[in-house]
Structures are given as C-alpha cells and as structure tokens.
Amino acid sequence: MELLSRVLLWKLVLLQSSAVLSSGSPGTAAASSSVVSESAVSWAAGTQAVLRCQSPRMVWTQDRLHDRQRVVHWDLSGGPGSQGRRLVDMYSAGEQRVYQPRDRDRLLLSPSAFHDGNFSLLIRAVERGDEGVYTCNLHHHYCHLYESLAVRLEVTDDPLLSRAYWDGEKEVLVVALGAPALMTCVNREHLWTDRHLEEAQQVVHWDRQLPGVPHDRADRLLDLYASGERRAYGPPFLRDRVSVNTNAFARGDFSLRIDDLEPADEGIYSCHLHHHYCGLHERRVFHLRVTEPVFEPPARASPGNGSGHNSVPSPDPTMARGHSIINVIVPEDHTHFFQQLGYVLATLLLFILLLITVVLATRHRHSGGCKTSDRKAGKSKG
C-alpha cells in the first residue's frame, strides 16, 4: 500500500505543470547569432593582421568528475531573516546526499530527475519542524546557470484544511500532520535533462565577405570544434596565410591572424561563436582595410668605408654647430709644434723691440723739450 501511494504521488508530479522553472538561456532554436561588436581595422600591406575574437564562456572544460557539473539541492529556512540549512542535494550522475540523519528515508528525490526534469521533493510524513520556506536550486557549473524556486509549507492538525494556493510570489502548501507533502519543482529544459557531447556542440567559425556581398553569402574560412577538429576553406591565396591558436578553446581566444597581408585581403570578416549546449550565439564583425606598405629609408653607410656611390657622407663631428664655437685642433707632430712656437717667440721679440723704440723716442723728445725751455729762460734774464 505504501509503495502504491508513492507511485501515485510521482505520477501526480509528472502531470503537474504549474510550477516549472524556466531556464535563463535561449533554446537551441535560437541558432542565429547576435552581433556583439563591429569595428573597422586597418593594417599595412606585408604585415600581420590580428582580428581579436575572445570569449571566456567558450572555454572548454571537460567534465572529468563523471557529470558532476549539474546539481540540484533543496534548502529550508524558517522565514525572512532566518538562516537556512541544506536538506538534500543530488548530482546529475545520480549521487544523492541527505545532510541530517533524521531526514534519511524521509526526504526523497527522484533518481531520474536529470532525465525527466522532475526535481520535486517528497516528505513522507510531515512533522511540526518541517514548516518553513523550501527552495529548489538548480546549478549548472559548466554553463554558469543558476535557477531557484521557493515553496512554503504549513502544517495543520485538521486534514480538512489541507490545500495548495499561490500567494503572489510562491506556492503555499497546507499539509496535515503526518501526511506526505510534495514540493513541486519541474524544469524540462534540455540543459537539465540531457547530457550531450558538449565538445560536438561547441564550434567557432570565421567568415569573409567581399564589399557588396551580403552576410548570408559570405565565404567560410575556418571551422574550429572543441574536440580539436579543424577545417580550412577559402581561396588558396588566403587559406595558407590565416591561422588561429591551437589552444583556442583552452584560452577562449579565437583571434584570426593573417600573415603577409595583401590588398586583395580587404573585406568583412566575421567571428561566429556557437555554444549550442549553453545557448550561446555571438558574432563579431571586422571591416578590414589594407593600407600602403611602409618603406623604411635605407641604412646609411658608415663613415670611411667607401661603400655605395650615392651614399651621403656623414657630417664631421668636429664641425661647429654654431658660429659662437671655434674648434682648435693641435696636431701631435713635434716639428710643427716647435715651428709654431718659433713664430710666437719672434712675434713677442718684435713686440719688445717696438716697445723699446717707443720708450726711447719718448725720452728723447722729453729731453729736447727741457733744453729749449732752459734757453728761453736765459734770454729773458739777459
């Protein structure tokens, strides 16, 4: 009889659809990607162009813990402001854990919850201490998604008062003491019910379209899969010059590199990021323009090497930069030094002789003047 009642309860849950969690990510039907960025870039011909396309949500982290990336847990709080406690949790691999010994065999979760989307909690016999707000929490660690649903449980002594109603925010269950209670939590989104091969649903591709060509007729350049598979398309003159890092899915960096850029490479490049499992569809657009190559002036020949007929001689570092500076170079030849010294001594000697001549002439004139004055004085006395 007890087993039959449990089966009837679970069948009732499958028919209920009033309390269904809705996932925050779009479904797989939304395969069209949305443009998240559009920019115009220019690179000189002959250089390497890098079109940046990065997304941390596309980082591939393989599940090495046997599908422990999805988990459901139920919490209980007495009301606003009260500290909640964990009741039970279960991973998508089937591992279930009840935290309190008194709740073992009293709290039940369906083992097929991650297959049919039924995460409802069954309390076999309600007690007074079971009153409070129950929260159903779904966590998808791989896709970084979190969903929650609250249900309030009230316990009554009169079985005739048992009922269920909506208070405007959450479902409220009024259950008789000792009777079973079913906290409904249903989410049938594929994220919670299926375990797809994520690496097969993660793909990045680069497209190229010439000016005037619509987006839906763009040429495919590259296809990248999280499994490691890569496919190259496009014209031969461009196929061998484009590349993406081999560890792109490990770093979330899918930037496109174009070597030896040519004018024919101009166009519109699009980076498409698709994570079908998590519902991610993004597109980044780049308008690439190729400019004239930058020519560097030829290197000048070093002074004195005599190389090159058209080479311009380097300026003499000893030349004066301005008119107020005079550079004097004294050779190291001793003969030339003594010759210059002789010129200086001869000039000095001539200057001394000239000075002596001037002194003698001055004295002679002074003595002649004195004699003339004496003669005039003698005549005046006589």
UniProtKB/Swiss-Prot annotation:
Q: Which stretches face the Extracellular side?
A: 20-340
Q: Where in the cell is it found?
A: Cell membrane; Cell junction, Tight junction; Cytoplasm; Cell projection, Cilium membrane
Q: Which residues does the record list as Phosphoserine (modified residue)?
A: 227
Q: What does this protein do?
A: Transmembrane protein which can modulate activity of various signaling pathways, probably via binding to integrin ITGAV:ITGB3. Mediates heterophilic cell-cell interactions in vitro. Inhibits osteoclastogenesis downstream of TNFSF11/RANKL and CSF1, where it may function by attenuating signaling via integrin ITGB3 and MAP kinase p38. Plays a role in cartilage formation where it promotes proliferation and maturation of growth plate chondrocytes. Stimulates formation of primary cilia in chondrocytes.
Report the membrane topology from the UniProt record. Single-pass type I membrane protein
Residues the record marks as site: Cleavage: 324-325
Is Nucleus one of the keywords UniProt gives this record?
yes
> Mainly resides where?
membrane
Which InterPro entries does this chain map to? Ig-like_dom (IPR007110), Ig-like_dom_sf (IPR036179), Ig-like_fold (IPR013783), Ig_sub (IPR003599), Ig_V-set (IPR013106), MXRA8 (IPR042472)
- Motif (RGD 2) on chain: 251-253
Its subunit composition reads: Homodimer in cis. Does not appear to form trans-homodimers. Interacts with ITGB3; the interaction inhibits ITGAV:ITGB3 heterodimer formation.
Listed as disulfide-bonded, the cysteine pairs are: 53-136, 185-271
Q: What is known of its domains?
A: RGD motif 2 (but not RGD motif 1) is involved in integrin ITGAV:ITGB3 binding.
Using the record's annotation, list all stretches that form the Ig-like V-type domain: 26-156, 159-291
Q: Name one GO biological process term.
A: establishment of glial blood-brain barrier
What keywords does the record list, in alphabetical order?
Cell adhesion, Cell junction, Cell membrane, Cell projection, Cytoplasm, Disulfide bond, Glycoprotein, Immunoglobulin domain, Membrane, Nucleus, Phosphoprotein, Repeat, Signal, Tight junction, Transmembrane, Transmembrane helix
Q: At which positions is motif RGD 1?
A: 128-130
Q: Does the keyword Transmembrane helix apply?
A: yes
Q: Which residues lie on this side of the membrane: Cytoplasmic?
A: 362-382
Identify this protein by name.
Matrix remodeling-associated protein 8
Q: Which residues cross the membrane?
A: 341-361
Segments carrying the region annotation (Disordered) are: 297-317
Q: Which residues form the signal peptide?
A: 1-19
GO CC term (a single one): cell surface
